[in-house]
């Protein structure tokens, strides 16, 4: 596993009063510890975002929902040409700056949204209850991005603001592969996922679907109970 001795975990190194049940050890643990352990396992041990497609030398990578930078940190030894990291949380962004002070990393303190405006949100780590939002199309234009080799997405429901009519030409023709977490935890997200699945997902050449524990669930993607059963899934998409 990659050496993490110099990696700054920010708020995740500070004990939180809030706890969460960890099924692996069958007891409640502090939220910061749970979140840190989950990230280490997902990104540095299981490498969930690179299970099927991998970042290669010279790639242009976009990391949407960069947090404190674990995914980008995990791929830097592959020498990507450029990594664009978006993170809306002000507290996590400060740590992101500490972890990724590299010439081939572009850090952006924004989150993907339906509009270029300030967005109220309950899903930001830290004390923030709003963030600076940007449309995916605006992000592409503002950063002069012509092509993305590897698009990684984990933005707490913001993924549905990426897969929109205005972005589909770019996503289908100017992105090599897309890997991310799709959230179905609320009723509104379940509605959005169904729309995304039935209208946009079928337009891509190759699609693989995994549960959060790595099980292949593509076979049941269009089953009646899929959307009701799952709260979160990992989708791997390729245009190649």
What are these language model-derived features?
Residues 1-240:
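Phosphate/nucleotide-binding beta-alpha loop and adjacent structural elements of enzyme active sites
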């Amino acid at each position: 596993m990659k050496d993490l001795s110099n990696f700054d975990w920010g708020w995740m190194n500070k004990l939180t009063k809030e706890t969460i049940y960890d099924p692996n050890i069958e007891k409640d643990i502090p939220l910061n510890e749970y979140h840190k352990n989950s990230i280490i396992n997902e990104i540095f041990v299981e490498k969930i975002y690179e299970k099927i497609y991998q970042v290669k030398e010279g790639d242009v990578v976009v990391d949407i929902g960069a947090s404190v930078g674990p995914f980008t940190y995990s791929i830097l030894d592959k020498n990507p040409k450029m990594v664009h990291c978006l993170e809306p949380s002000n507290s996590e962004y400060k740590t992101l700056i500490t972890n990724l002070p590299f010439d081939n990393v572009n850090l952006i303190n924004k989150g993907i949204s339906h509009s270029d405006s300030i967005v109220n949100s309950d899903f930001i780590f830290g004390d923030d209850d709003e963030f600076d939002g940007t449309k995916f199309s605006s992000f592409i234009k503002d950063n002069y991005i012509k092509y993305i080799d590897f698009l990684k997405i984990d933005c707490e429901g913001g993924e549905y603001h990426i897969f929109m009519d205005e972005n589909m030409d770019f996503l289908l023709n100017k992105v090599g592969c897309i890997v991310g977490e799709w959230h179905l935890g609320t009723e509104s997200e379940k509605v959005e996922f169904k729309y995304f699945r039935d209208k946009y997902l079928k337009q891509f050449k190759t699609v693989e679907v995994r549960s959060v524990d790595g099980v292949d669930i593509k076979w049941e993607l269009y089953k009646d109970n899929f959307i009701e059963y799952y709260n979160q899934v990992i989708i791997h998409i390729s245009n190649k």
